[in-house]
């Protein structure tokens, strides 16, 4: 009874499609994919920034206020 069979998965998938519809699921999948790509990109950008700081190859710029 505790096992998840392919039949149970198909029934759950059919219920989800009936409840939400294929259009809503398609847009939800696209939004989820975009969010994951954005998260991965942000993680890679932050890792690159940390490596630059550790190497010391990037110097901090002095900022001044112009009036």
From Swiss-Prot:
It comes from the Bacteria. Signal peptide: none annotated. This is Probable Sec-independent protein translocase protein TatE. It comes from Salmonella typhimurium (strain LT2 / SGSC1412 / ATCC 700720). Belongs to the TatA/E family. TatE subfamily. One of its GO terms (molecular function) is protein transmembrane transporter activity. It is found in: Cell inner membrane. InterPro entries: TatA/B/E, TatA/E, TatE. Part of the twin-arginine translocation (Tat) system that transports large folded proteins containing a characteristic twin-arginine motif in their signal peptide across membranes. TatE shares overlapping functions with TatA. The chain crosses the membrane at residues 4-21. It is a single-pass membrane protein. One of its GO terms (biological process) is protein transport by the Tat complex. Keywords: Cell inner membrane, Cell membrane, Membrane, Protein transport, Translocation, Transmembrane, Transmembrane helix, Transport. One of its GO terms (cellular component) is TAT protein transport complex. The gene is tatE. Its main location: membrane.
